[in-house]
């Protein structure tokens, strides 16, 4: 008689992200993970380079898949036990332009003043590579955020806190930037950097225990 026993679940996954927010969000839904970060000889930033004329949704999907493939190669080279690998990437877009991580304080201030008093989109793509090395179809979370028309001085003070650096669009919704946000339509966790609804669905497909 055929066995009805389901394949065993993986007790952990590999998270290929340095983002503390993504780590916190995985812990929020009970996922155990081990970090799988780029080696010193890897140029992780090069994967985030834009292609001419590339739309924001195509960009964030492409970057996420590229990061996932790099992480899978890193795992194989490390000799660590096989387990699913999770990668995500977030970008902000307004007027068809992609706003990545600010290069410096002036860049951060320019981004924030561009967002002021207007609505923009936050796109986060999530990719999971199964323990067998197969890439699951990536998920895309799309949210709208409206910033208040705050005074320029308020944005200057925000930049001086250092919080905008390393954040797409130069702000963190879970931090002090919350004072500028009039409303959102979409996924709060997606805006933070890891949409939990879509992520949970991918992890179930990859048979990750949580």
From Swiss-Prot:
Q: What is the reaction catalyzed?
A: dTTP + H2O = dTMP + diphosphate + H(+); UTP + H2O = UMP + diphosphate + H(+)
Q: Which InterPro entries does the UniProt entry name for this protein?
A: ITPase-like_fam, Maf-like
Name the major location: cytoplasm
Give the GO terms filed under biological process for this record. nucleotide metabolic process
> One cellular component GO annotation, for this chain's record?
cytoplasm
Q: Which CDD domains match?
A: Maf
Q: Which cofactor does it need?
A: a divalent metal cation
Listed GO MF terms: dTTP diphosphatase activity; UTP diphosphatase activity
Top enzyme class of this protein?
hydrolase
Site (Important for substrate specificity) residue list: 21, 90, 174
Localisation per UniProt entry:
Cytoplasm
Which terms are listed as keywords in the entry? Cytoplasm, Hydrolase, Nucleotide metabolism
Q: What is its EC number?
A: 3.6.1.9
So where's the catalytic machinery, residue-wise?
A: 89
Q: Which HAMAP family match?
A: Maf
What does the function comment of this entry state? Nucleoside triphosphate pyrophosphatase that hydrolyzes dTTP and UTP. May have a dual role in cell division arrest and in preventing the incorporation of modified nucleotides into cellular nucleic acids.
| Listed NCBIfam families | maf (TIGR00172)
Q: Which family does it belong to?
A: Belongs to the Maf family. YhdE subfamily.
Q: What is this protein called?
A: dTTP/UTP pyrophosphatase
Instruction: Name the species this protein comes from.
Output: Burkholderia orbicola (strain AU 1054)
């Amino acid at each position: 008689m055929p066995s009805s026993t389901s394949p065993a679940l993986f007790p952990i996954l590999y998270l290929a992200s340095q983002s503390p927010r993504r780590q916190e969000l995985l812990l929020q839904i009970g996922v155990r993970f081990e970090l799988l970060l780029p080696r010193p000889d890897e140029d992780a930033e090069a994967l985030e380079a834009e292609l001419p004329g590339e739309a924001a949704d195509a960009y964030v999907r492409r970057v996420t898949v590229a990061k996932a493939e790099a992480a899978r190669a890193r795992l194989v080279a490390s000799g660590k036990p096989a387990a699913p690998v999770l990668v995500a990437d977030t970008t902000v877009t307004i007027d068809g332009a992609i706003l990545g991580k600010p290069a410096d304080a002036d860049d951060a201030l320019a981004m924030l003043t561009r967002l002021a008093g207007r609505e923009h989109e936050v796109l986060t793509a999530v990719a999971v590579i199964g323990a067998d090395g197969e890439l699951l179809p990536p998920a895309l979370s799309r949210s709208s955020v409206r910033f208040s028309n705050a005074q320029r001085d308020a944005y200057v003070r925000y930049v001086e806190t250092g919080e905008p650096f390393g954040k797409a669009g130069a702000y963190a919704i879970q931090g002090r930037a919350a004072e500028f946000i009039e409303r959102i339509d979409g996924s709060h966790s997606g805006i933070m950097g890891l949409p939990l609804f879509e992520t949970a669905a991918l992890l179930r497909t990859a048979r990750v225990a949580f």
